[in-house]
From Swiss-Prot:
This is Oligoendopeptidase F, chromosomal. Binds 1 zinc ion. Its cofactor is Zn(2+). Its EC number is 3.4.24.-. It comes from Lactococcus lactis subsp. cremoris.
């Protein structure tokens, strides 16, 4: 039975008093920051470029207030997440969100004033006369890089007005898909009739009973088939918004606009898709192996997620902590001390309680600990989640300790590398420690499935996303028929399973929320691949390799993303890191195939 919040031992909860010792102090700080923001328009707007001194002063003031806003927000957000039923912290969350909006509105003048009125020559002279501006040089350099794509204040204001309209395709999808659409009733493994939901679909697809999987799969996609024209319209409109925004800002494409916003060259995307295409035979081999293990001659898409091992790993939290510390010790003393601090100083909210937010995350702000939320159940997945979130938290801690606030964060493009590197090292460690063939079989299957779902599947999404934006930009209509055909062909190309014999999968595009995120998913694939490459260097490389990795963790956003990850020895415009990742996939697939030949799966 799930406990109430007050029944959880204090040692297993996060210590948010290190942010604000009392709620009253949070409320006092909130009012103070609101007052500071109320003065911005009067004191700063229109004066940013009066002189080098005003540029420096207003920039420092903006960053100082931003730092305070983030601290207020994370306290409210985490208080709310620990028990979402508490009205007080729901109110705190609303107030903190409103403060974020207020901050954005107050400093809306900053970029347009900077880019419209400041020439690089003038800025260069100011740098010579006021050395302190150099502390923000990379931030200003990023702004100058946007210059040809920035809108005037008047244009920006006009386009800000229909902002809610531009959000409506994704919001309509979300409401329709999560609230309005009701899936049919199906039978579970016990033969009980249950209503199919997004929440239970995953567990039904992992059922050992093939009839249960088939029924859930067909029931789910019958709904998407029935509503395909509505989903096509929301997706088409969303793509049009992306293409429109790119066009008016003088980008060549929506993809260029999305990637350049994070200073990621388009070549990274192209190298990924090219590398994936070259190694699709490996995925086809893995599918054939699943087919052999499950003894299914007419293998279908609903057989993809069936666990190949029923080995039940169990870890209590104390064992999980010990294992995480052992595994992450490979990074050296500096990293290990931070991991120890995370456990000793209560950075982690461990157990599930009534009203607690589901899932897991790493959070915090520049001025706080890098807190983590878990919902520990003692499974192998929970151990992987622990080291994953620890990867984010130690990345954040290194960044915040080594960079000023202006560079004290990092883009999602870099974030997933630090977390999945830890997952890869955990896999390597568990495999190294295990001589039991059934254990090795389970671990290899776990990693190969993660690779398939993160690298191959997300790349399939990325390829689909690129194609639909290109087709819309050429003036073609994204009808449901076109989307079905494109997705079915891609799925056959990736998995080697006939589109004709798997007709339901052509509707999968309709259920993927990431297609509304604007060229986001490719980062999962690049991140996992880079992490596989780095983990191999850390485990089998030199002390220098490990130090280079720490240098990447410490860099934050003090340089462009590709320059930061290059510190860890990864060139993401080259196929080398992908080749290394696929080589590891093949190595582990080879071992799994040999174990199957020996009958270990039986």
């Amino acid at each position: 039975m799930v406990k109430n919040r007050n029944e959880i031992p204090e040692a297993l909860t996060w210590d948010l008093t290190t942010i604000f010792s009392t709620d009253q102090k949070w409320e006092t700080e909130l009012e103070k920051v609101k007052k500071e923001l109320s003065l911005v328009e009067t004191n700063d707007k229109g004066h940013l470029l009066d002189s080098a001194e005003t540029l420096l002063t207003i920039t420092k003031n903006m960053l100082s207030i931003s730092q305070k806003v983030e601290k207020l927000y994370v306290y409210a957000s985490m208080k709310n997440d620990q028990d979402t039923r508490e009205a007080k912290y729901q109110d705190y969350q609303s107030k903190a969100t409103a403060l974020y909006v207020n901050f954005g509105e107050s400093y809306a003048f900053y970029e347009p004033e900077f880019l419209k009125n400041l020439q690089k020559e003038t800025y260069g002279k100011w740098l010579e006369t006021l050395q302190e501006l150099k502390n923000y040089d990379h931030m200003f350099e990023r702004l100058f890089a946007k210059k040809e794509h920035i809108l005037s204040q008047k244009e920006g204001k006009i386009l800000a007005a229909p902002g809610e309209i531009f959000e409506s395709p994704s919001e309509t999808f979300e409401i329709f898909d999560n609230a309005d659409v009701k899936f049919p009733f199906v039978k579970n493994e016990l033969g009980e009739k249950i209503q199919l939901t997004h929440g239970n679909y995953g567990s039904l697809m992992e059922s050992e009973n093939r009839e249960v999987r088939k029924a859930a799969y067909e029931a789910l996609y019958s709904n998407y088939e029935q509503c395909q024209h509505t989903y096509a319209k929301t997706l088409q409109t969303n793509v049009k918004v992306h293409n429109f925004n790119a066009q008016i800002r003088a980008y060549d494409s929506a993809r260029q606009a999305a990637l350049m916003s994070n200073f990621v060259p388009e070549k990274v995307y192209d190298v990924l898709i090219e590398g994936i295409h070259q190694h699709l035979p490996l995925l086809h081999r893995y599918i054939e192996l699943r087919k052999k293990i499950l003894e299914i001659s007419d293998f279908k898409m609903y057989d993809i997620y069936t666990p190949l091992s029923n080995l039940d790993y169990k870890f209590n939290y104390t064992e999980g902590v010990k294992k995480a510390q052992e595994v992450l010790a490979i990074f050296g003393e500096e990293y290990s001390q931070k991991v120890k601090a995370a456990f000793d100083e209560r950075w982690i909210d461990v157990e599930e309680n009534v009203g607690k937010r589901s899932g897991a995350y790493s959070g915090g702000s520049y001025d706080t600990k890098a807190f983590m939320l878990l919902n520990w159940q003692g499974t192998l997945d929970d151990l992987f989640t622990l080291v994953h979130e620890m990867g984010h938290s130690i990345h954040s801690t290194f960044t915040r300790e080594n960079q000023p606030y202006v560079y004290g964060d990092y883009p999602i493009f870099l974030a997933e590398i630090a977390s999945t590197t830890n997952e890869n090292i955990l896999t390597e460690t568990l495999l190294k420690e295990s001589n039991d063939e059934k254990e090795r079989f389970a671990l290899l299957n776990h990693w190969l499935d993660s690779f398939r779902g993160t690298v191959f599947r997300q790349s399939q999404f990325a390829e689909f996303e690129q194609k639909i934006h290109e087709v819309d930009a050429e003036g073609e209509v994204l009808t449901s028929e076109f989307l079905n055909s494109l997705y079915g062909e891609l799925n056959e190309k990736y998995y080697g399973l006939s589109a004709k014999e798997n007709p339901e999968i052509q509707f999968e595009w309709a259920k993927i929320p990431h297609f509304y995120y604007n060229f986001y998913v490719f980062q999962y694939a690049t991140g996992f691949s880079a992490a596989s490459f780095i983990a191999e260097k850390v485990v089998h490389g030199s002390v220098t390799d490990r130090q280079n990795y720490l240098d990447y963790l410490k860099a934050g956003s003090s340089a462009y993303p590709l320059d930061v990850i290059a510190k860890a020895g990864v060139n993401m415009e080259s196929t080398d890191y992908l080749e290394s990742a696929f080589k590891l996939f093949e190595k582990r697939l080879n071992e799994l195939e040999k174990l199957v030949e020996k009958g270990v799966h039986l």
